[in-house]
Design a protein with these regions (language model features):
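Extended interfacial segments that mediate partner engagement and assembly in macromolecular machines
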Residues: 1-16
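Rossmann-like S-adenosyl-L-methionine
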Residues: 38-184
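Structural motif
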Residues: 29-30, 124
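Residue-level marker of positions within ordered structural domains that often coincide
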Residues: 7, 24, 119
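Short edge beta-strands and adjacent turn/loop segments
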Residues: 13-26
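Short beta-strand-to-loop capping motifs
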Residues: 33-37
Length: 184
């Protein structure tokens, strides 16, 4: 549906350079259209129409139009992923252009494996490059305290939101590089 709509709409097709997808296991999807031109109200109207067509076919969709120094968000600039891990559901906000594990099913297995390895652990955990808290949140249940470091501002923001959303209180997020951690 998306491809057909883009091919048949000259406003959406004109200087379209790239299409990016961010999807959840539940089917929620964020589509980013990247252009080599300035986006105007005509583009926004065409994208709104596309969003309406997509919404009639599946779970929630959002569209982002990007061009040099320009970002137009129709809907949200994130998806909400829910991962069932060891008899608990964890909710993760995943932002556009921020790293997230691309395969939700494999991600669940990786997290469960890490939690199994940590099941007998005691004490505290130091996690480097925690991203949006993908491993941090589930692993925090196996430790007294967690210090999680990350460089990316958007990932730190997502991790903070994810900790709050999941009611996890034993994690401290710090914006540091691994090099800064080793110097501390």
């Amino acid at each position: 549906i998306l491809r057909e709509h883009l091919q048949n709409n000259s406003t959406l097709r004109h200087k379209l350079f790239q299409v990016e997808f961010l999807a959840t296991l539940s089917g929620e999807m964020l589509i980013t259209l990247v252009y080599h031109r300035t986006l105007d109200t005509e583009w926004e109207d065409a994208a709104e129409a596309l969003l309406g067509v997509l919404a009639s076919h599946a779970p929630p969709f959002s569209i982002i139009g990007r061009s040099r120094k320009q970002k137009i968000v129709l809907g949200k600039d994130f998806v909400q992923e829910t991962l069932p891990i060891q008899d608990r559901e964890f909710r993760f906000r995943q932002y556009e252009q921020a790293f997230s594990q691309p395969n939700g099913s494999v991600n669940i297995r990786m997290i469960e494996w890490a939690c199994e390895q940590a099941a007998m652990a005691q004490g505290d955990l130091l996690e480097l490059y925690c991203g949006n808290g993908n491993f941090t949140l589930p692993l925090s249940l196996h430790f007294d305290n967690v210090i999680a470091t990350e460089l990316s501002k958007s990932s730190i923001r997502a991790a903070r939101e994810n900790l709050l959303e999941n009611g996890i209180k034993n994690v401290q997020l710090v914006r540091l590089s691994a090099e800064e951690v080793t110097q501390a």
